[in-house]
């Protein structure tokens, strides 16, 4: 079990309050020990966002998921890995780090001071969605067991990661903010 919140699906957009800083406190279920989000942690399970758009574009994973950390050019990256899967975590972490390093070489300066990959390992389904400082990706639990599946998750993560630049920062004004 876990909790996952996509704020764009559950928060109301209030233009009157959109420009100012936002605060969020999470009270996890008593059995859940971890919260992963790209929002700035200000202690415990309390978070802040610069404005409503940043809050709305910051998904939240709550539970007892695995957390793996790495850096790309001194920028902290984290993987929040929910659900059982037969994965070589050392190889997977190294491959995700290599992908992120190569992406930054292609595009140049990194637009974030931190980044979060939320990965849901499910019985079925899949896909991903980019966010301002993170992505949420869903794959089947067996994804890591075949070369084709493993290449698929790496392609998905690379695709969503490139959206840091193309879509989240390089886009028509109509797709603002």
Locations of regions flagged by a protein language model:
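Extended, low-hydrophobicity, Ser/Thr/Pro/Gly-biased non-transmembrane segments
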Residues: 1-61
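Juxtacatalytic substrate-recognition/specificity segment
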Residues: 66-177
């Amino acid at each position: 079990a876990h909790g996952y919140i996509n704020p764009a699906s559950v928060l109301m957009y209030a233009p009157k309050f959109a420009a100012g800083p936002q605060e969020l406190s999470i009270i996890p279920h008593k059995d859940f020990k971890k919260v992963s989000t790209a929002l700035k942690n200000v202690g415990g399970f309390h978070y802040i966002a610069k404005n409503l758009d940043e809050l709305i574009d910051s998904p939240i994973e709550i539970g007892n998921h695995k957390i793996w950390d790495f850096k790309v050019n001194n920028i902290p990256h984290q993987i929040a890995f929910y659900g059982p899967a037969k994965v070589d975590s050392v190889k997977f972490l190294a491959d995700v780090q290599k992908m992120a390093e190569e992406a930054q070489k292609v595009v140049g300066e990194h637009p974030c001071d931190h980044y979060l990959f939320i990965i849901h390992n499910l019985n079925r389904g899949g896909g991903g969605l980019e966010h301002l400082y993170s992505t949420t990706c869903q794959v089947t639990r067996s994804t890591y067991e075949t070369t084709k599946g493993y290449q698929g998750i790496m392609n998905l993560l690379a695709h969503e990661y490139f959206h840091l630049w193309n879509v989240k920062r390089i886009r028509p004004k109509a797709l603002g903010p």
